[in-house]
């Protein structure tokens, strides 16, 4: 059995005389086939999706929208600083008709306790670089310089940092002196003595403030209430309170040097008089009972 290898040769006609005409017909047929394929190619459609839950990833959203039709490209917008999703994405379907159907059906759809907003984007508004690097997997942004600066250092590493700052400070001062600029700026490294003095000052000021507060509180507790506000609540009329009021009235009268005479009656005598007035009623009742008997 003979085996054929290599690419297929050109199509030849059975009659060698009609070979030229046959090749022209073949070329025309091929053009028609290519034109039909171009006409059959579907125009893609892009859908703008909004109000997406923050916990969803690209793979989950891609698999969810792929049930409507073939998804050619997909992009979920994320923050460059944190890497978290911004809540909106762009989905490109193979056919424009499918994209319009998805936008109509999924608009105002309750998805993860949120109402989705889906809008069809016309091809004029779609940017060329909208789906740039869409197939590259997402990686959380890392800041090595920040991690390096915030890491815990040993004493030797701290001393090295201080030496570097001192060298930079010297170079700056030399450059300014060469250019004839008289400019004094604070040192890049704070001295320990200054920090200790500041802490001592802060503690002393705090102690003084606390002492003043204590004095104010003690003064308010020791001072008795000598006066009574007219607009305030009425005090309870106890015997001691009445005697105090009478003595105050007497002092005021003495100061004015009036000739009026004030009779001070003790409260006990008033009680005795009330008891004496009440006793005859009991005696009359007893007399009536004895007379009836």
From Swiss-Prot:
<feature type="modified residue" description="Omega-N-methylated arginine; by PRMT1 and PRMT8">
    <location>
        <position position="244"/>
    </location>
</feature>
<dbReference type="InterPro" id="IPR035979">
    <property type="entry name" value="RBD_domain_sf"/>
</dbReference>
<feature type="domain" description="RRM">
    <location>
        <begin position="45"/>
        <end position="123"/>
    </location>
</feature>
<feature type="cross-link" description="Glycyl lysine isopeptide (Lys-Gly) (interchain with G-Cter in SUMO2)">
    <location>
        <position position="139"/>
    </location>
</feature>
<dbReference type="Pfam" id="PF12196">
    <property type="entry name" value="hNIFK_binding"/>
</dbReference>
<feature type="region of interest" description="Disordered">
    <location>
        <begin position="197"/>
        <end position="239"/>
    </location>
</feature>
<feature type="modified residue" description="Phosphoserine">
    <location>
        <position position="247"/>
    </location>
</feature>
<dbReference type="GO" id="GO:0003723">
    <property type="term" value="F:RNA binding"/>
</dbReference>
<feature type="compositionally biased region" description="Polar residues">
    <location>
        <begin position="197"/>
        <end position="207"/>
    </location>
</feature>
<dbReference type="InterPro" id="IPR012677">
    <property type="entry name" value="Nucleotide-bd_a/b_plait_sf"/>
</dbReference>
<feature type="modified residue" description="Phosphoserine">
    <location>
        <position position="218"/>
    </location>
</feature>
<dbReference type="GO" id="GO:0005654">
    <property type="term" value="C:nucleoplasm"/>
</dbReference>
<feature type="modified residue" description="Omega-N-methylarginine; by PRMT1 and PRMT8">
    <location>
        <position position="284"/>
    </location>
</feature>
<keyword id="KW-0007">Acetylation</keyword>
<feature type="modified residue" description="N-acetylalanine">
    <location>
        <position position="2"/>
    </location>
</feature>
<keyword id="KW-0597">Phosphoprotein</keyword>
<feature type="modified residue" description="Phosphoserine">
    <location>
        <position position="230"/>
    </location>
</feature>
<dbReference type="GO" id="GO:0005737">
    <property type="term" value="C:cytoplasm"/>
</dbReference>
<feature type="compositionally biased region" description="Basic residues">
    <location>
        <begin position="282"/>
        <end position="293"/>
    </location>
</feature>
<keyword id="KW-0158">Chromosome</keyword>
<comment type="subunit">
    <text>Binds to the FHA domain of MKI67; this interaction is enhanced in mitosis.</text>
</comment>
<feature type="modified residue" description="Phosphothreonine">
    <location>
        <position position="234"/>
    </location>
</feature>
<feature type="modified residue" description="Phosphothreonine">
    <location>
        <position position="238"/>
    </location>
</feature>
<keyword id="KW-0488">Methylation</keyword>
<keyword id="KW-0832">Ubl conjugation</keyword>
<feature type="modified residue" description="Phosphoserine">
    <location>
        <position position="145"/>
    </location>
</feature>
<dbReference type="GO" id="GO:0065003">
    <property type="term" value="P:protein-containing complex assembly"/>
</dbReference>
<feature type="modified residue" description="Omega-N-methylarginine; by PRMT1 and PRMT8">
    <location>
        <position position="114"/>
    </location>
</feature>
<dbReference type="GO" id="GO:0005730">
    <property type="term" value="C:nucleolus"/>
</dbReference>
<dbReference type="InterPro" id="IPR021043">
    <property type="entry name" value="NIFK_FHA_Ki67-binding"/>
</dbReference>
<feature type="cross-link" description="Glycyl lysine isopeptide (Lys-Gly) (interchain with G-Cter in SUMO2); alternate">
    <location>
        <position position="271"/>
    </location>
</feature>
<feature type="cross-link" description="Glycyl lysine isopeptide (Lys-Gly) (interchain with G-Cter in SUMO2)">
    <location>
        <position position="192"/>
    </location>
</feature>
<protein>
    <recommendedName>
        <fullName>MKI67 FHA domain-interacting nucleolar phosphoprotein</fullName>
    </recommendedName>
</protein>
<feature type="region of interest" description="Disordered">
    <location>
        <begin position="271"/>
        <end position="293"/>
    </location>
</feature>
<feature type="modified residue" description="Omega-N-methylated arginine; by PRMT1 and PRMT8">
    <location>
        <position position="245"/>
    </location>
</feature>
<dbReference type="GO" id="GO:0016072">
    <property type="term" value="P:rRNA metabolic process"/>
</dbReference>
<dbReference type="GO" id="GO:0005694">
    <property type="term" value="C:chromosome"/>
</dbReference>
<feature type="modified residue" description="Phosphothreonine">
    <location>
        <position position="223"/>
    </location>
</feature>
<dbReference type="GO" id="GO:0009303">
    <property type="term" value="P:rRNA transcription"/>
</dbReference>
<keyword id="KW-0694">RNA-binding</keyword>
<feature type="cross-link" description="Glycyl lysine isopeptide (Lys-Gly) (interchain with G-Cter in SUMO1); alternate">
    <location>
        <position position="271"/>
    </location>
</feature>
<feature type="cross-link" description="Glycyl lysine isopeptide (Lys-Gly) (interchain with G-Cter in SUMO2)">
    <location>
        <position position="38"/>
    </location>
</feature>
């Amino acid at each position: 059995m003979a085996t054929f290898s290599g690419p297929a040769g050109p199509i030849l006609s059975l009659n060698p005389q009609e070979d030229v005409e046959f090749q022209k017909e073949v070329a025309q047929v091929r053009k028609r086939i290519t034109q039909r394929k171009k006409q059959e190619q579907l125009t893609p459609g892009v859908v703008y999706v909004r109000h997406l839950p923050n916990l969803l990833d690209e793979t989950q959203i891609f698999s969810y929208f792929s049930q409507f039709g073939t998804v050619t490209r997909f992009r979920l917008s994320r923050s460059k600083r944190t890497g978290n999703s911004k809540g909106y994405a762009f989905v490109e379907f193979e056919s424009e008709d499918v994209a319009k159907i998805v936008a109509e059906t999924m608009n105002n759809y309750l998805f993860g306790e949120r109402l989705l907003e889906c809008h069809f984007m016309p091809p004029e508004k779609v940017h060329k670089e909208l789906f740039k690097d869409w197939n590259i997997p997402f990686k959380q942004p890392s800041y090595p310089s920040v991690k390096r600066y915030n890491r815990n250092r040993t004493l030797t590493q701290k001393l090295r940092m201080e030496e570097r700052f001192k060298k930079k400070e010297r170079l700056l001062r030399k450059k300014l002196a060469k250019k004839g600029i008289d400019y004094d700026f604070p040192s890049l490294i704070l001295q320990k003595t200054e920090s200790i003095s500041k802490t001592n000052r802060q503690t002393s000021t705090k102690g003084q403030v606390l002492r003043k507060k204590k004095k104010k509180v003690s003064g308010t507790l020791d001072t008795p209430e000598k006066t009574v506000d007219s607009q305030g609540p009425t005090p309870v009329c106890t015997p001691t309170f009445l005697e105090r009021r009478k003595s105050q009235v007497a002092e005021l009268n003495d100061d004015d040097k009036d000739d009026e005479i004030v009779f001070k009656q003790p409260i006990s005598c008033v009680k005795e008089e009330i008891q004496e007035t009440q006793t005859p009623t009991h005696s009359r009742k007893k007399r009536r009972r004895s007379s009836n008997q």
